[in-house]
Amino acid sequence: MRGWRFPDPTPGNSPIPLLTSAAQAVVMASPRLRYGRYSRTGNVYVLTTVTVRREPLFADAANVAVLVDALRFVERAGISHSLAWVVMPDHVHWLMELQMGTLAECMSLLKSRSSRLLNQQLGRRGALWQHGYHDHTVRSDESLHEKAMYILANPVRAGLACEVGEYPHAWCRWPL
């Protein structure tokens, strides 16, 4: 398989040490969990990124407005086509179609623009987002509308809203 390295079973011949326990496998594999990340224009992704120390910066509507502006900036730049998003107090979920470039470039632009503008607005410096992000490629047999509804239901599951559509910091391309 491309992107994966399997150890040579002959002792001493592998640059990757052989695993001796399941716990060791988890610890050793974790730095490469997203090694196989693959981005392709035209694919739809669910992306999640979290603030440093899970700081609830987006409990403030003014900060949410800055992040929403950054999401729209990435779309206006032709990099993404947003289908749905929800801004939770300490993270964002984003359903989008990649239009140009890579996921890494897309997320880098979103994070750098929102960080710069938010730090300026808050009169602070430093990292706003944790390193990395979680991505899920939406398969062709998965319903985009169902994915969007799942994302929009996050505030309900977190106890921030009673029903989908009530939370003010969410948006969807389709009617609810």
For the regions a language model picked out, list residue spans one by one:
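Short catalytic/metal-binding and nucleic-acid-binding patches
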Residues: M1-L176
